[in-house]
UniProtKB/Swiss-Prot annotation:
It comes from the Bacteria. This is Elongation factor Ts. It comes from Caldicellulosiruptor saccharolyticus (strain ATCC 43494 / DSM 8903 / Tp8T 6331). Gene3D superfamilies: 1.10.286.20, DNA helicase RuvA subunit, C-terminal domain, Elongation factor Ts, dimerisation domain. Keywords: Cytoplasm, Elongation factor, Protein biosynthesis. It is found in: Cytoplasm. PROSITE patterns: EF_TS_1, EF_TS_2.
Amino acid sequence: MISAEMVKELRERTGAGMMDCKKALEDANGDMEKAIELLRERGLAKAAKRASRVAAEGIVESYIHGNGRIGVLVEINCETDFVARNEEFRQFAKDIAMQIAAANPKYVSREEIPQEVIEREKAILRQQALNEGKPENVVDRIIEGRLEKFFEEVCLLEQPWIKNPDMKIKDLLTEKIAKIGENIVIRRFARFERGEGIEKAASC
């Protein structure tokens, strides 16, 4: 039996509609965590449909961390000015700016990584595997696994979210698209760290 309290709790936790929550709980036989997974899966389907829509509105969010030690600017686009002013969207932008400050990604997505960077990383990983004495026939498989770890480190969308490491940023983005009901795009970002690239003079 699905109670009104269960539907309310699921709605509060996911932001999904009441009927969607009730249906997910029924399909999950009252299992709250399974219902959340079902809603996320269904959200993915909704998000995929919205991903083709033009997102030209949005916000440029800034974040300063550690008494001016690290600064971030990130542009996040949505479809309408109405959503750009929405508190949920603005909080998402803040979360993404904080993620960039903390996790220091180099690219938004793996598609942005130049092919020569990937090839160079593969060559390094191959040499590492051979130096470890791994058999030649398993080296390629090892490289693929380690390359995924590389993507997780350098690509914002592939990184575990600092507020919930069980969720990647791309999952969080998909969740927000489903919840807000518009296509959302993390367009670009810049991260600055005080003194980065400046060689300090040696003290006498």
